[in-house]
């Protein structure tokens, strides 16, 4: 016996299955072009579970142990232990899609509460129960805009400061529907209204803006952006997140038709993935919403019951009529976000958001006292979580030197770094300021 926990089919089992389907060899079940097939040994030695764990831990120890001040779309907040305790219950962590509502009422109710949280924060009429991440949610918003617009058109306008990775996903995901993605100029970390107005025409189907922006600034001209979009019969899509939305103007109050973003700021640590795409929109677009919706109804006994509804995905209807061709979502991550939000409560969520205004303001003031550093770059703006700082020395060199000191920051251009501070790294701000002083003076 190998000690493996996996029971692979015996030779007799394999022969019986091949005989049942009428073939002689396993190879006959596949049609793989020779140029991409592999017929050889992998060169991987069999290991026990204990040996495999040692190898993985040894490899993980090669990672740099940095205190991150990175941000730019990925923000870590303290996640209470309650979130792990509840979300790792077997009925949650082993559940797949809730196709059998009679046995998944608990999970469905949590997802309904998650949707309700987003509806309350955005002021919009409907929110789905998650998408992959902010980038795919933005791409789905562009496709929705193209579907619902009365007139023809295919142009989508995004601010110049939006991360290249988001724009790449947007372009790639919409490439089959002739959507043209264009950037419009920004001014001092915010929308340049003159540039946006000059870019508008009858072919624009959606205008995208952020609050807070990729630069960390609070966008102060959202109503004007919404008016511009509306005057050209284009949808206004706003990017944000649940923590920031708890203290900012509600998206519906500035004219937003769609809200996208990443809700993994609640319930999840930062990592190489596992985002939580936000998608909320006006109720009139209900049947155009991508992904899944959890609805509340009644069972045969008249008791409130939850179920998946309006699943207009290609998994359920004809592909050409589907609103989305992404066939899964982030239900378990949404569950964690809902648990975290419930733990915070309305007041706690606001307190956390207000702290995210105070922390960057205080840290920027301290860095501004360092010789060779000017912070924040956008000193006439309010910031949430992050800000940009000008460095006399080349920013890439400053970022590399800080990495050697154990801190991670983004170099966003030749002489600008971006710094993010939250409740997860505020304990290290004294050491961070000292490191910046050491590498800058």
From Swiss-Prot:
Gene3D superfamilies: Aspartate Aminotransferase, domain 1 (3.90.1150.10), Type I PLP-dependent aspartate aminotransferase-like (Major domain) (3.40.640.10). The keyword Ribonucleoprotein does not apply. Keywords: Oxidoreductase. SUPFAM superfamilies: PLP-dependent transferases. Its EC number is 1.4.4.2. GO terms for molecular function: glycine dehydrogenase (decarboxylating) activity. GO terms for biological process: glycine decarboxylation via glycine cleavage system; nucleoside metabolic process. It comes from the Archaea. Pfam families: GDC-P. CDD domains: GDC-P. It catalyses: N(6)-[(R)-lipoyl]-L-lysyl-[glycine-cleavage complex H protein] + glycine + H(+) = N(6)-[(R)-S(8)-aminomethyldihydrolipoyl]-L-lysyl-[glycine-cleavage complex H protein] + CO2. The glycine cleavage system catalyzes the degradation of glycine. The P protein binds the alpha-amino group of glycine through its pyridoxal phosphate cofactor; CO(2) is released and the remaining methylamine moiety is then transferred to the lipoamide cofactor of the H protein. Belongs to the GcvP family. N-terminal subunit subfamily. The glycine cleavage system is composed of four proteins: P, T, L and H. In this organism, the P 'protein' is a heterodimer of two subunits. This is Probable glycine dehydrogenase (decarboxylating) subunit 1. It comes from Halobacterium salinarum (strain ATCC 700922 / JCM 11081 / NRC-1). The gene is gcvPA.
């Amino acid at each position: 016996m190998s000690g493996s926990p996996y029971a692979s089919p015996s030779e007799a089992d394999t022969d019986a299955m091949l005989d049942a389907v009428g073939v002689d060899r396993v190879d006959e079940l596949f049609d793989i072009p020779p140029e991409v097939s592999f017929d050889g040994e992998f060169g991987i030695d069999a290991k026990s579970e204990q040996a495999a764990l040692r190898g993985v831990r040894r490899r993980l120890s090669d990672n740099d142990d940095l205190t991150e001040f990175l941000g730019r779309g990925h923000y870590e907040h303290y996640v209470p232990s309650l979130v792990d305790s509840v979300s790792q219950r077997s009925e949650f962590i082993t559940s797949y899609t809730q196709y059998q509502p009679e046995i998944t009422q608990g999970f469905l109710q949590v997802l309904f509460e998650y949707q309700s949280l987003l509806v309350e924060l955005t002021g919009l009429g409907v929110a789905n129960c998650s998408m992959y991440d902010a980038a795919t949610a933005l791409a789905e918003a562009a496709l929705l805009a193209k579907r619902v617009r009365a007139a023809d058109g295919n142009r989508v306008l995004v601010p110049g400061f939006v991360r290249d990775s988001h724009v790449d996903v947007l372009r790639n995901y919409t490439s089959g529907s002739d959507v043209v993605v264009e950037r419009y100029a920004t001014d001092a970390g915010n929308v340049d209204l003159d540039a946006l107005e000059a870019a508008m025409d009858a072919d624009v189907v959606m205008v995208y803006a952020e609050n807070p922006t990729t630069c960390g600034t609070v966008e102060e001209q959202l109503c004007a952006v919404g008016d511009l979009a509306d005057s050209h019969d284009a949808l206004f899509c706003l990017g944000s997140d649940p923590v920031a939305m708890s203290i900012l103007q509600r998206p519906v109050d500035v004219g937003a038709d769609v809200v996208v973003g990443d809700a993994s700021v609640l319930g999840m640590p930062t990592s190489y993935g596992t985002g939580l795409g936000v998608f909320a929109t006006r109720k009139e677009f209900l049947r155009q919403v991508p992904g899944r919706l959890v609805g509340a109804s009644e069972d045969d006994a008249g008791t409130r019951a939850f179920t998946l509804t309006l699943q207009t995905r290609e998994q359920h209807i004809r592909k050409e009529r589907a609103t989305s061709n992404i066939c899964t979502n982030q239900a378990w991550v949404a569950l964690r976000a809902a648990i975290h939000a419930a733990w915070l409560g309305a007041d706690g969520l606001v307190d956390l958001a207000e702290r995210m205004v105070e922390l960057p303001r205080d840290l920027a003031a301290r860095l501004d006292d360092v010789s060779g550093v000017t912070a924040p770059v956008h000193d006439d703006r309010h910031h949430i979580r992050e800000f940009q700082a000008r460095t006399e020395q080349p920013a890439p060199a400053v970022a590399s030197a800080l990495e050697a000191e154990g801190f991670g920051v983004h170099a966003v251009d030749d002489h600008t770094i971006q710094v993010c501070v939250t409740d997860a790294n505020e304990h290290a701000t004294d050491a961070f300021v000292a490191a910046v002083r050491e590498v800058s003076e």
